[in-house]
């Protein structure tokens, strides 16, 4: 990764590539950030912090590093080939294998959307007293309407604004608590596995590194338009993309860390376990004051809405890719994929008995599909037939395989610990 940084930012400089020019290209990575500050993350992070204090902050750091490498690789695929991960899967894998991979990814995306919609519904219940099931229908309807009636650029602006609201909300919450920063700093870089933490560790991993984001990032990045064509444009896009990914994933790491720290300093410190987001918000009031629970609920609502939109977009990307097409909300394959995803998500929300447990287990299920998507991505980006001169180097390939192995091992730990 350091070599990538030197190559993209230190080895040469072309005119007009200043800070403002780079800032104009920040956006695709923030769409991915939305996916790992979603309600599923809230449930996993609250469980991690309330049950184990600061001890599991290291998995947030590890997951974010893994995410940076994987998302950069997915974006690399989109830039070098002009095809997203779903399209490349259809083009370069045997038909039956490609359909199986994309089918499992689509089911994982429905599980993702369920978590996002359910989280938004829980926020509506906190704020207005609405029943969770009614809230699920409202959140899904609003999210689908945003996708069906807005271009990508308009949706991107809304989503970036939502990320800002969530980030500022957690800054406000942290200002209300006393954080043991030396202990937090040590926990960010010191792995530990307290007794009973295996399922939470894997759910945090599944909440940060998510398969649908790999499909979404590769689609969004390859759909951006740059002037000119050829290798020079590809190199330029790779420079911008790496900065965008590093910046955006850093924002996500900070917000996820803030969730764990908030839970550790409030619930764990008082001997309470946050096994329900609504109860967690209500419990904040007597500890931190009445404004804290409202801030918590507003941030959760914006997180649920924005991540529901990106989950729906990823679903449309996958179904379009099955037919070797780019995502286009006005295209039949994309729009059907979006609509079916939200219908499936709402149906799941209506039958799940416990919303909080539904959020936790949706993240664990995502982590079980993740190795499939990761190894398909590695297979494609390491192939000169697919990537040409931009195929993965051996060191990068080794790193990616190592990440895939870690994901798989953690999945085995989850299954054997159930």
Regions found by a protein language model. Name each.
Residues 66-74, 96-116, 121-151, 206-207, ...:
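Helix-loop-helix module between adjacent transmembrane segments
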Residues 158-161, 331-336, 355-415:
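C-terminal membrane-solvent junction of multi-pass transporters and transport-like membrane proteins
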Residues 67-80, 221-222, 230, 250-279:
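Extracellular/periplasmic helix-exit of transmembrane alpha-helices
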Residues 4-10, 44-49, 72-97, 122, ...:
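Flexible loop linkers connecting adjacent transmembrane helices
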Residues 102-103, 127-148, 165-169, 328-347, ...:
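Transmembrane alpha-helical segments of multi-pass small-molecule transport proteins
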Residues 32, 59-91, 101-108:
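Juxtamembrane transmembrane-helix boundary signature
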Residues 163-190, 205-221, 376-385, 410-418:
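Hydrophobic alpha-helical segments and their helix-loop junctions in multi-pass secondary transporters
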Residues 95-98, 133-136, 247, 291-293, ...:
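Loop-to-transmembrane helix boundary motifs in multi-pass membrane proteins
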């Amino acid at each position: 990764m350091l070599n990538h940084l030197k190559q993209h930012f230190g080895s040469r400089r072309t005119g007009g590539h200043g800070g403002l020019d780079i800032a104009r290209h920040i956006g695709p990575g923030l769409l991915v950030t939305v996916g790992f500050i979603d309600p599923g993350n809230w449930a996993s992070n609250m469980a991690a912090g309330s049950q184990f204090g600061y001890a599991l902050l290291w998995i947030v750091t590890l997951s974010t590093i893994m995410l940076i490498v994987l998302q950069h690789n997915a974006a690399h695929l989109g830039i070098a080939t002009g095809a997203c991960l779903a399209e490349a899967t259809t083009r370069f894998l045997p038909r039956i294998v490609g359909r199986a991979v994309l089918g499992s990814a689509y089911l994982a995306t429905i599980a993702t959307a369920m978590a996002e919609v359910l989280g938004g519904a829980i926020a509506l219940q906190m704020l207005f007293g609405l029943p969770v099931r009614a809230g699920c229908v409202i959140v899904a309807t609003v999210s689908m309407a945003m996708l069906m009636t807005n271009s990508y650029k308009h949706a991107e602006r809304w989503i970036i604004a939502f990320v800002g609201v969530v980030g500022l909300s957690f800054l406000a919450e942290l200002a209300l608590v006393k954080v043991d920063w030396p202990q937090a700093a040590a926990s960010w870089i010191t792995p530990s596995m307290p007794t009973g933490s295996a399922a939470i560790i894997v759910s945090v991993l599944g909440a940060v590194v998510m398969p649908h984001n790999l499909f979404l990032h590769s689609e969004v990045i390859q759909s951006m338009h740059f002037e000119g064509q050829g290798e020079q444009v590809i190199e330029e896009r790779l420079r911008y993309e790496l900065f965008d990914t590093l910046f955006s994933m850093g924002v996500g790491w900070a917000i996820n860390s803030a969730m764990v720290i908030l839970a550790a300093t409030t619930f764990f410190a008082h001997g309470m376990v946050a096994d329900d987001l609504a109860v967690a918000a209500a419990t904040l009031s007597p500890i931190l004051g009445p404004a804290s629970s409202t801030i918590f609920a507003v941030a959760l609502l914006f997180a649920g809405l924005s991540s529901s939109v990106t989950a729906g977009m990823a679903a449309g990307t996958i179904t379009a890719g099955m037919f070797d097409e780019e995502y286009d909300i006005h295209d039949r394959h994309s729009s059907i994929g979006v609509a079916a995803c939200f219908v499936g998500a709402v149906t799941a929300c209506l039958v799940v008995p416990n919303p909080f447990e539904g959020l936790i287990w949706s993240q664990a299920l995502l982590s079980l599909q993740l190795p499939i998507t990761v190894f398909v991505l590695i297979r494609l980006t390491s192939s000169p037939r697919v990537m040409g001169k931009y195929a993965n180097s051996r060191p990068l390939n080794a790193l990616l395989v190592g990440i895939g192995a870690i994901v798989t091992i953690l999945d085995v730990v989850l299954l054997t610990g159930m």
